[in-house]
Amino acid sequence: MFREVIRTISPYIPGKPISEVKRELGLEKVIKLASNENPLGPSENVKKAIKESLDDLSLYPDGNCTELKLKLAKKLNVKPTQIIFGAGSDEITQLIASIFINPGDNSIMARPSFPRYETVTKVMGGIPIEIPLKNYTHDLEEFSKHINERTRVIWICNPNNPTGTIVKKDELYNFIKSVPSEIAVVVDQAYKEYIDDPEYPDAIHWLDEFKNLIVLQTFSKIYGLASLRIGYAIASEEIIEKLNRVRPPFNVNHVAQIAAIAALDDQEHIEKAKELNKKSLEFFYKSFEEMKLPYIKSYGNFVMVDVTKDAVEVFKKLLLKGIIVRPGDIFDMPTYIRVTTGLESDNMEFIKALKEVL
């Protein structure tokens, strides 16, 4: 009954929701540090805009996200026709695979990295070529060695999820320049807004030069709109036109569009989230060093720390204390956990609990 490839695909397993943990374990308080969400949530301006939009829930949304597209295009200094929106950037990865990958084609990605790249490749009957990380980041030299006549897409998560590492400007530019123009290069910048490092490359600046480049970004992370599912891609007008051919109608709901428009105007909230994240990472690094736990310096809003024992067991023990993190076994890092930066009090509770379970 089912396509053979479906047997090879594992469903995505999200971080445990707070309500489920409370119900299963009978806990009154649960701190979720598992899914790289903004602990500040959306800004007050966004909440106000959402409340004012509720009378329109009976109407279909703007299928082209016109107002949002115009506003974002101005902010990014690109044409509106270079942008497409999706129900999270997850959906756009599926659209990308559907316009480029035929059965038997391949796409290249790092391992571990964002798991959807592998999934969407398999769904199209493609072959995922997974290149192990080198020093916890993308090994682009090895990527180049695996490009062949059946390669259709190259996925680069920058910063990488789950390790939080980056490919620096010159290395990424030279790699993209070396890739044949008929192969799509996707640079996923979900955590870009957290970064101030001058060596971090914003690939949007290269779109005029590389017509095969696609840049993914999202409102789920620093903007605090994860539950509304809205992300976007910026690329050449030709690529965006092809993506729109396979995009479902009305794929981004009205409330998500309204929230994103309001979020773009609230730079003060973004700066506040960046500052909190910076302080949280510094606190984690200091705490891990005191505990003599190795960790990977992160450019995102999360950090991978080596707990030096079975991460699943540590995850379970933390769960009993009302702390949700991500065990690293799903990333082929069986002694690591990934922890999202939280509010100051949440971070302190996590470190206290971690000391108790180790």
UniProtKB/Swiss-Prot annotation:
<dbReference type="InterPro" id="IPR015422">
    <property type="entry name" value="PyrdxlP-dep_Trfase_small"/>
</dbReference>
<dbReference type="InterPro" id="IPR004839">
    <property type="entry name" value="Aminotransferase_I/II_large"/>
</dbReference>
<dbReference type="GO" id="GO:0000105">
    <property type="term" value="P:L-histidine biosynthetic process"/>
</dbReference>
<dbReference type="InterPro" id="IPR050106">
    <property type="entry name" value="HistidinolP_aminotransfase"/>
</dbReference>
<comment type="pathway">
    <text>Amino-acid biosynthesis; L-histidine biosynthesis; L-histidine from 5-phospho-alpha-D-ribose 1-diphosphate: step 7/9.</text>
</comment>
<keyword id="KW-0663">Pyridoxal phosphate</keyword>
<comment type="subunit">
    <text>Homodimer.</text>
</comment>
<dbReference type="InterPro" id="IPR005861">
    <property type="entry name" value="HisP_aminotrans"/>
</dbReference>
<keyword id="KW-0368">Histidine biosynthesis</keyword>
<keyword id="KW-0808">Transferase</keyword>
<dbReference type="GO" id="GO:0004400">
    <property type="term" value="F:histidinol-phosphate transaminase activity"/>
</dbReference>
<keyword id="KW-0028">Amino-acid biosynthesis</keyword>
<dbReference type="GO" id="GO:0030170">
    <property type="term" value="F:pyridoxal phosphate binding"/>
</dbReference>
<comment type="similarity">
    <text>Belongs to the class-II pyridoxal-phosphate-dependent aminotransferase family. Histidinol-phosphate aminotransferase subfamily.</text>
</comment>
<dbReference type="InterPro" id="IPR015424">
    <property type="entry name" value="PyrdxlP-dep_Trfase"/>
</dbReference>
<dbReference type="Pfam" id="PF00155">
    <property type="entry name" value="Aminotran_1_2"/>
</dbReference>
<feature type="modified residue" description="N6-(pyridoxal phosphate)lysine">
    <location>
        <position position="221"/>
    </location>
</feature>
<keyword id="KW-0032">Aminotransferase</keyword>
<protein>
    <recommendedName>
        <fullName>Histidinol-phosphate aminotransferase</fullName>
        <ecNumber>2.6.1.9</ecNumber>
    </recommendedName>
</protein>
<dbReference type="InterPro" id="IPR015421">
    <property type="entry name" value="PyrdxlP-dep_Trfase_major"/>
</dbReference>
